[in-house]
Amino acid sequence: KTAYYGLFSMQHRGQEASGISASYNHQIKTIKNRGLVTEVFDNDSFEILQGQMAIGHNRYSTAGSDSVLDAQPVSAKYSLGEISIVHNGNLINKHEVRERLIEDGAIFQSNMDTENILHLIAKSKKENLQDRIIEALEQIVGAYCLLILSRSKMFVVRDPYGIRPLSIGRLKDGGYIVASETCAFDLVGATYVRDVAPGEMIVFEEGKSAFKSIELFEAKDPRLCAFEYIYFARPDSMIDGKNVYQIRKKLGEILADKSSCKADFVVPVPDSGVPAALGYAARSNIPFEMAIVRNHYVG
């Protein structure tokens, strides 16, 4: 249930669909569907999704459609066995890559750029999965955080610019958890270890207590998506060592310094705007009021 609780704690990152793949007894089982985490999974799901390794995904569509075919994880059988992939990001050369793959005979079942990566891995002639992943990544350009699950290993990759966040936590039983936000660690009682570095691959292997780190690409100048700090992330998360709530509040203070005004109240647009409004109100000595109330169960 660790993967389930992790997805539940990050429901804010996507509400269209949810899915989990788990590796058990040299088989990968996947359950995914449209809807919230609590709507997709039940007790019967946990009976199916057994194992020591699992990956999960909440969908917020930036590419593809809202069809269940575009829900993740994306799983397939290929010459080396089975794999399942989840991807947070966007590939800017997805159309060129897809056209080339189709010309080579690939058949696509979804509109997701994630499926491009799956085909590149399957098409590779490298002898092991790790080398196939590396070869595939050399052909894509854009933002990506990837979790790739095989029957006995899990590969974690962050793009060279670190556009999307990705962190590693340690569970109380000695296992590891990887998530886009550290708020997922809190719900399962995990402690923060470190962020996955831009351009880094982390390899977890079943039965081994330590993970392996590989520098795939030289890290570029950090280009973390600005929307993570101001909108996407939960305020209690840490991203690249910085607390999201404190960053938002500080931005409000800076705005008050640079663009002060006479006003009766400082009113936030909930929910992401609340910390910034608090910072603005405190710095400008203008009363803070919740004049806009959001209904969390509509829209």
Regions found by a protein language model. Give the residues of each.
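Alpha-helix boundary/capping detector
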Residues: K123, E127, A281-A282, I292-V293
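Short, glycine/charge-rich flexible loops or terminal/linker lids adjacent to PRPP-binding catalytic cores
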Residues: N285-G299
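Residue-level detector of flexible, active-site-proximal loop/helix-junction positions
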Residues: T62, G273, N295
